[in-house]
Amino acid sequence: MTKNPFSTADNTLSEPALRGGGRVPTSSRVYRELRERIIALDIPPDAILVRSDLAERFDVSQSPVREAILRLEQDGLVISYPQSRTVVTRIDPARVREEHFLRTAVECEVVRRLAEAGDPEALKKARGFLKMQEALVDDMDQVDLFKQLDEAFHEALFSGVNQPNLHRHIQARCGHLARLRTLDLPSPGKTAQVLAAHRSVMDAIEAGDGDLSVRTMREHLSGSLRRMPQIVEEHLELFC
């Protein structure tokens, strides 16, 4: 089992800029940072999370840490053993397929509605994210930024049908799928494929073709799932 990832002095947590300008509750900050590191595989499956160590690292009491861990449990990203330890879960292929089903069903409906009556400002914003992604294609030093822009692109689509909260809900429920995508995105040619798929989705939406929008989005969201057997074979230690 992987040792506690917070047990050494050089493994520190950075403080990201707070989003939205408002004050973020302490438990939400702890949850968000831990979740981001788990999704990025900086905290890998089987890693042990010790509440007292986390409280020290975040300079908080154990109460917000407990709340954050509870949310991570609800996301299926950790398992807590009473009076013992909290362990990061391995990626579960069955859960990946469930999460893919959920995300595909919802996001295909989003693009269909956008094609029928899209918000021009939201679509303009989505196009802007694609231009930024274009500058990063095949730059493996910028994979993390490319991934952030990918998430921003999809969030813009949800905002275009006035469903930004639904996008956050989908993100929270798709942690296993997100970790699979973390493994897949650095693959040769993958970022170029993602960008091309995003462009195809936008072209279909802007053409007002709901059926084509759905087909292109479904194809786009299924790429990592199709590659999952190969990814599992290459990273057996990360999967259950």
Segments (PLM) and residue ranges:
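Short linear motifs at protein or domain termini
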Residues: 1-116, 121, 225, 229-240
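Short, surface-exposed helix/turn micro-motifs that flank interaction/cofactor sites
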Residues: 39, 66, 73, 158, ...
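C-terminal regulatory/effector modules of DNA-binding transcriptional regulators
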Residues: 1-2, 57, 186-240
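Alpha-helix N-cap/N′ positions at the starts of helices
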Residues: 83, 106, 128, 193-196
